[in-house]
Amino acid sequence: MIKHYIKDHVAVVTLSRDGGLNALSSQMLVDLLKIYKEIEKNDDVKVVVLNSDRRDFCAGGDLKEVYESFSKCNDRNCLMSYFTKEYDLDLFLATTKKPTITFWLMKR
């Protein structure tokens, strides 16, 4: 779902989810945070490029997953689990020292 590599001081992170308009699932949030933390520690990386290899860049959060998760357990903690992961990623991205360039080349 998330591809990444480092070349010439640039970390390239690619959203690559089949179906779902690249909506961010819980696992994608966890994976993105892990990748960004690894990049942050790597002094060789000067910039991050975030892109997509799908027709759609990213629809945002996976609301279907949030709804289904909450419907199964009907507990506020189930709902908060997703949003905690999302907030953790948002906070990290807002405070990281590495600049991120985001772009999308629409594929038809």
Please place each PLM-identified region on the residue numbering:
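Glycine-rich beta-to-alpha active-site loop
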Residues: 93-108
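Alpha-helix capping and helix-loop boundary segments enriched in small/acidic/polar residues
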Residues: 23, 77-80, 106
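Glycine-/small-residue-rich active-site loops that bind phosphorylated ligands and cofactors
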Residues: 20-21, 55, 107-108
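Conserved CoA-thioester-binding segment of acyl-CoA-metabolizing enzymes
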Residues: 1-51
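Catalytic-core regions built around general acid/base machinery
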Residues: 35, 85-96
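Glycine- (often His-adjacent) and acidic-residue-rich active-site loop
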Residues: 52-88
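Short beta-strand/turn micro-motifs composed of small residues
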Residues: 51-52, 104
